[in-house]
Amino acid sequence: MKILCSFVIALLCGGSSLSAAQQWKDTIVVARDGSGDYRTLTEAMEGIRAFMDYKVTVLVKKGVYKEKVILPSWLENVDFIGENAENTIITYDDHANINKMGTFRTYTLKVEGNSITFKNLTIENNAARLGQAVALHSEG
């Protein structure tokens, strides 16, 4: 009975650690149409473990992603790869004259983490000509 109980406990513990390992993917797909793991880049970041020691690839399907994105300092070792730069666009429209936010807060995408790369996509600030604006703000 003691051996059976130990076996059941070991099986349950092993099963829960396997579930935790399966929770963190090394490839994530973002697609506006819902065909991927996430619909937005912001949602995808929630699916990436903090301070990873392995590389994660985020495949971004073509589409226009209108969102203000912050990649926090705990997000490291991530490659964002778009389908192509002409049709995979991350955009927002803040500018310096909105609520006196100043130029440095107008970014579309802010990178605070290290070892973050972007390939085959466009990052733009689509603000009207009402004030200065930043597309990419990098601190990492």
Language-model features and meaning:
Residues 61-62, 119, 139:
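Short His-Asn-centered micro-motif
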Residues 1-23:
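Bacterial Sec-dependent N-terminal signal peptides
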Residues 63-67, 85-87:
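Short active-site-proximal "capping" loops at secondary-structure junctions
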Residues 32-34, 57, 76-132:
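Right-handed parallel beta-helix/beta-spiral solenoid domain characteristic of secreted/periplasmic
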Residues 25-59:
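Acidic Gly/Asp/Thr-rich repetitive segments characteristic of extracellular carbohydrate-active
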Residues 71-72, 128-130, 137-140:
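Low-complexity, polar/charged sequence tracts that form flexible coils or short amphipathic helices
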Residues 39-50, 66-74, 80:
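Short, T/G/N/S-enriched strand-turn elements that build extracellular solenoid repeat scaffolds
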Residues 27, 68, 108, 133-137:
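Structural detector of coil-to-beta-strand junctions
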